[in-house]
Amino acid sequence: VYTADPVPPAALGAERPVATFCSWDSELTLGEGRSIPAWLISEVTVRPTHARRGLLRRLMTQDLTEAHEAGFPVAALTASEATIYGRFGFGAATFNAEVTVDAHSRLQLKAPTVGTVEMADNLAVAELAPQIFERFHRATAGSLRRTVKWWDYVSGQWNWHRGAAEPELRTAVHYDEQGRPDGYVSYKFLPTQGYEG
């Protein structure tokens, strides 16, 4: 959304958006091999200088109306400020967990290891990850299909924030006991102020 108002001197130009909104069709797994069409929403922003003018309400209402008219039975969104979307019928469906591993001391895993993990070539992971995810997606209730660009992101071929490749990203693949790939991870080492050894 771009402003039609005159732009004062030194302000961001009219060619810069004052609000963004992205939506696309996808698929939501219900479990037991069943899935339904889903309408996904992301990248919803309103510039603080244009807040409280009804932009979010108009964008969301128009988009959800079009999704409903197109026959989508469910809509889902990613949001950094989830509380503002309750008025549109959205609520928390899942939570995120983050794990930090202290690698300075000896790390002992209590569960028995199953299969193996190998460092992987990022381009190979870009090809392999969609196949691994498809098996997970079909078996996991609540899973949403990934976009094509996602595989570039998890393999370091593209970073949304940087707008370019991310060559420092590393990948690894988990192989089951029969040697079939059944999981992957992408990660990077963050710079530190020094090493505590």
Segments from the language model and where they lie:
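Amide-forming acyltransferase catalytic core, primarily the GNAT-like/NAT-type
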Residues: A97-G197
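Conserved active-site alpha-helix within GNAT-family acetyltransferase domains
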Residues: H68-P73, A79-E98
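A short, internal acetyl-CoA/4′-phosphopantetheine-binding micro-motif in the GNAT/acyltransferase core
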Residues: I41-A51, S80, Y175, G197
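Conserved beta-strand in the GNAT
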Residues: T3, A10-S26, L40, T45, ...
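Exposed loop/turn and edge beta-strand positions of beta-sandwich/beta-sheet ligand-binding modules
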Residues: S35, L40, E168
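Short secondary-structure capping/junction motifs at helix and strand boundaries
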Residues: A70-T78, A139-R146
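Short, conserved catalytic-motif segment at the N-terminal edge
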Residues: S26-S35
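Conserved acetyl-CoA-binding loop-helix of GNAT-fold acetyltransferases
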Residues: E43-V46, R52-E69
